[in-house]
Design a protein with these regions (language model features):
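Glyoxalase I/VOC metalloenzyme domain signal
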Residues: 17-21, 26-45, 63-296
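Histidine-centered divalent-metal-coordination microenvironment in nucleic-acid enzymes
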Residues: 60
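Bacterial N-terminal signal peptides
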Residues: 4-13
Length: 296
């Protein structure tokens, strides 16, 4: 009986262990300041081109594990009506910084069915794309998970229709090798226990590990092997609570995995779930970005 139960849970547990970050998105009203601020922190991005939606353009920093950090902003003279149609319109107009994340899927249709079987709302795949500055055309399909705007609470799902390396590696190699990739997505939530319940339902996760970080001003929860930290404000006066009031439940910070942490200046440090994390100066960067220190 016990063996049968373990076998029945195995697919969900395997999925949770294999949940891979495709990319994370930072939003702003103009691309130049986003690029300049990240470059000043020592992580220069490369321009990736305009999206086919007629409203946004992007730059990116890709990493050796294939994940990348996307800077997304409004195209010059974009039609306000087209901007309104974007799922992250308020982040773009309000310089919201972290706004979304995506999970890489080889079998998008299969994952849609799995989530539906777990009673998680998920949309049918929709095609999209963009053109790189060198005229290379990129195409992909995505599905939204949950009822919130795309990729804010749950990751949205993405599957490439053209070669993924063309999207992730515009220079045919990682843009930055000082970091392994995107290690954690930190999601601001109003009710930590309710958010934990939804993630466990969607991905078959074990009970979380919790801690309090007064420096980050949040109750934190780490769920199994997925690259997610849920963060609930410690108080009504928290910066996190103000962010929730303005942007809703969504990513509030991203954490990179560092290969060469000594090359970068940390404005502050903390320790999450036994791992040391250094934070860039959010006042200078305009949003919160950290990196895990490897324990060699």
């Amino acid at each position: 009986m016990r063996g049968a139960l373990i076998l029945s849970l195995l697919p969900a547990l395997l999925f949770a262990a294999d949940l891979k970050i495709d990319h994370v998105t930072v939003a702003g009203s103009s691309l130049n300041p986003l690029q300049a601020n990240l470059s000043a922190a020592g992580i220069p991005p490369v321009y990736g081109g305009a999206h086919t939606n007629g409203a946004t353009e992007m730059a990116l920093v890709s990493f050796p594990d294939g994940s990348y950090l996307e800077l997304m902003a409004l195209q010059a003279n974009a039609d306000p009506h087209l901007i309104d149609q974007q799922p992250w319109a308020k982040f773009l107009r309000g310089n919201g910084g972290p706004c979304a994340w995506a999970a890489r899927e080889k079998d998008l249709a299969g994952e849609v069915k799995r989530l539906e079987a777990a009673s998680i709302p998920v949309s049918a795949p929709v095609r999209s794309g963009r053109q790189r500055p060198d005229a290379v055309r990129l195409e992909w399909e995505t599905s939204d998970v949950g009822t919130e705007p795309r990729g804010t609470f749950f990751p949205f799902l993405i599957r490439d229709l053209t070669e993924r390396r063309l999207r992730a590696f515009p220079q045919a190699k990682p843009v930055n090798r000082d970091f392994r990739g995107i290690a954690k997505v930190v999601i601001a939530v109003r009710d930590l226990d309710a958010a934990i319940k939804r993630y466990r339902q969607a991905y078959g996760l074990p009970a979380p590990i919790k801690q309090v970080d007064p420096g980050f001003d949040a109750h934190l929860a780490l769920l199994g092997g997925v690259p997610v930290v849920l963060a609930q404000p410690l108080s009504a006066e928290s910066w996190l609570n103000e962010r929730l009031d303005q942007f809703g439940e969504a990513p509030c910070a991203f954490v990179l995995g560092a290969n060469r942490p000594g090359r970068y200046h940390a404005a502050s440090q903390t320790r999450w779930f036994g791992i040391e994390i250094s934070w860039f100066d959010s006042g200078k960067l305009g949003w919160r970005l950290g990196f895990e220190i490897p324990e060699w």
